[in-house]
Regions:
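Conserved catalytic or regulatory cores that recognize and/or transform ribose-phosphate-containing ligands
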Residues: 1-110
Length: 110
């Protein structure tokens, strides 16, 4: 059990806004992929929208800041899907680089 607790913590970055149902389903799949790689997924966009309103700018910003706090304790950030137009994911990538985290882009079907 000790080995499992010490697996790499991976911050899962993928888009949330837009087609939320499809994006949440995709994020769950990405987390399963991280688990299959013997790592621990951390997906703030599956957590904070459950308690914060993503359509309220103040609450959205709070959720993003909470996510960046989680990113700080992760070993790496893995980016999934088309993230080119996701402002939140781009912010997470910038923060990860500032923190010296490995940024990995995972292609679909990897």
């Amino acid at each position: 059990m000790y080995e499992i607790k010490n697996r790499k913590k991976i911050y899962v970055a993928s888009k949330y806004a837009g087609n939320v149902d499809a994006n949440v389903a995709a994020a769950i799949g990405y987390c399963k992929y991280v688990i299959s790689q013997n790592c621990i997924p951390i997906a703030s966009h599956l957590l904070y929208p459950q308690m914060l309103d993503d359509n309220d700018p103040d609450e959205r910003e709070l959720g993003l800041m909470f996510g960046l706090s989680l990113l700080a304790i992760c070993d790496e950030i893995w980016c999934f899907g088309d993230i080119s137009e996701s402002e939140g994911v781009q912010q997470e990538i910038v923060e990860a680089r500032k923190l010296g985290k490995t940024v990995r882009y995972v292609k679909e079907g990897s």
